[in-house]
């Protein structure tokens, strides 16, 4: 497909070539382990092109997988896309593809908690050194790069506290010291389209497709879209690690992407309205929504992102007691308590300052009030605000 089209058009038409759709609107759902060859010559041809979208063996993918991979590459401008069973698998296998014993990794100190645990447990067991940096470090990232630094891992915005790093400055400073460093980003919040990672000289853009790509909280999948420099190594290492996703999940993810454009617009509109309302409430100390000036790195968001999604957090003026947490959290009518996000439904979680400090031992944010994370779904926004208002009344 021609890349001159707007994203909203591309979401609809990419990954729907006749080879994938066989004449139907959607790509076919092809479930297969064994894929049949008509002749020795056919088998030889498939073997030679097994990494290039040729049907070879189920673990390499079927037409269903190829259609989604084509769509993802079109979306994010990559040379290739690998599919994983969840977002964490995409993160961990992307890192593992480029490190060995004795190497060094630079990891955001505000990254997703399981990503940090992977570094502290698995990578350290492999005798790979980790240095955690403050996502607001900017050009000083250069001072942390060592001769054996192989991977620089970014996340934008940061998990829970929502900082937006100065990504172009960080990338430029890192490349100046080590042009060959592999730079990857957890790009889930932007759905890979609100921030175009590969256009900012990042090598690999990773998503928990479980969230916005699927969009309905019913499938788990991870994606990693790589540039030409890193694609072959990422693909082969991930394949050797046995990473794959079933055809049904790939099919459902591609179907979810068809409505991604309209969903992101609604997430943005509703979340900003809720965030602005929260910023005016006496119970709220600070709102950490990248689109609001109160969020650290807001100026970088305005410069580098084309829009926002539905996830943000806000700090209360007080640390809630255990009794207050229950009163506040247990009685919402529209907000549900759950991990993950990115679906059509609104979600809420509460973290205490000491809990944030525990999962962020390498950076300090000096939170004093309870930190509430919300994902704003597609309910009527005034009714969501009323639900939050009732929550504040319960802890008054």
Swiss-Prot record:
- Gene3D superfamilies this protein is in? Aspartate Aminotransferase, domain 1, Type I PLP-dependent aspartate aminotransferase-like (Major domain)
Q: Name one GO molecular function term.
A: pyridoxal phosphate binding
Q: Which EC numbers characterise this protein's activity in its record?
A: 4.4.1.13
GO biological process annotation, one example: transsulfuration
Task: Tell me which residues bear N6-(pyridoxal phosphate)lysine.
Answer: 211
Domain of life, source organism: Bacteria
EC class (word): lyase
The alphabetical list of record keywords is:
Amino-acid biosynthesis, Cytoplasm, Lyase, Methionine biosynthesis, Pyridoxal phosphate
Q: Which cofactor does it need?
A: pyridoxal 5'-phosphate
Gene Ontology CC: one annotated term: cytoplasm
Q: Which reaction does it catalyse?
A: L,L-cystathionine + H2O = L-homocysteine + pyruvate + NH4(+); an S-substituted L-cysteine + H2O = a thiol + pyruvate + NH4(+)
InterPro entries for this protein: Cys/Met-Metab_PyrdxlP-dep_enz, Cys_b_lyase_bac, Cys_met_metab_PP, PyrdxlP-dep_Trfase, PyrdxlP-dep_Trfase_major, PyrdxlP-dep_Trfase_small
Asked if Lyase is a keyword of the record, the answer is yes
Could you give the subunit structure recorded for this chain? Homotetramer.
**What family is this protein classified in?**
Belongs to the trans-sulfuration enzymes family.
Q: What does this protein do?
A: Catalyzes the cleavage of cystathionine to homocysteine, pyruvate and ammonia during methionine biosynthesis.
Name the UniProt record assigns to this protein: Cystathionine beta-lyase
């Amino acid at each position: 497909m021609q890349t001159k089209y707007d994203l909203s058009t591309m979401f609809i038409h990419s990954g729907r070539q006749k080879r994938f759709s066989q004449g139907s609107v959607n790509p076919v759902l092809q479930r297969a382990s064994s894929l049949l060859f008509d002749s020795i010559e056919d088998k030889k041809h498939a073997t030679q092109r097994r990494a290039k979208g040729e049907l070879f063996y189920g673990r390499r993918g079927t037409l269903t997988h190829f259609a989604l991979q084509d769509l993802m590459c079109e979306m994010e401008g990559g040379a290739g896309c690998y599919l994983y069973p969840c977002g964490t698998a995409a993160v961990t296998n992307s890192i593992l593809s480029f490190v060995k014993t004795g190497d060094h990794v630079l990891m955001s100190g505000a990254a997703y908690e399981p990503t940090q645990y992977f570094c502290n447990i698995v990578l350290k067991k492999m005798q790979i050194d980790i240095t955690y940096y403050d996502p607001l470090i900017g050009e000083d990232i250069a001072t942390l790069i060592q001769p054996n630094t192989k991977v620089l891992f970014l996340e934008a915005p940061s998990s829970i506290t929502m900082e937006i790093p100065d990504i172009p400055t960080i990338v430029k400073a890192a490349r100046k010291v080590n042009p060959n460093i592999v730079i990857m980003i957890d790009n889930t919040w932007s759905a890979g389209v609100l921030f175009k990672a590969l256009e900012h000289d990042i090598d690999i853009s990773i998503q928990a497709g479980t969230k916005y790509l699927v969009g309905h909280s019913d499938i788990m999948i991870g994606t990693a879209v790589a540039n030409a420099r890193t694609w072959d190594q990422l693909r082969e290492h991930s394949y050797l690690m046995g990473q794959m996703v079933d055809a049904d999940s790939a099919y459902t993810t591609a179907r979810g992407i068809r409505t991604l454009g309209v969903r992101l617009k609604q997430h943005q509109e509703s979340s900003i309205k809720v965030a602005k309302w929260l910023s005016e409430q006496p119970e709220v100390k600070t709102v950490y929504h990248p689109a609001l000036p109160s969020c650290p790195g807001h100026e970088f968001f305005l410069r580098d992102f084309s829009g926002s999604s539905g996830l943000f957090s806000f700090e209360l003026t007080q640390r809630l007691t255990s009794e207050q947490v229950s009163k506040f959290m247990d009685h919402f009518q529209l907000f549900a308590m759950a991990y993950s996000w990115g679906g059509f439904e609104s979600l809420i979680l509460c973290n205490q300052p000491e809990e944030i400090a525990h999962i962020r031992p390498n950076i300090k944010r000096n939170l004093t009030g309870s930190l509430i994370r919300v994902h704003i779904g597609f309910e009527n926004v005034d009714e969501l605000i009323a639900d939050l208002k009732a929550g504040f009344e319960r802890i008054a």
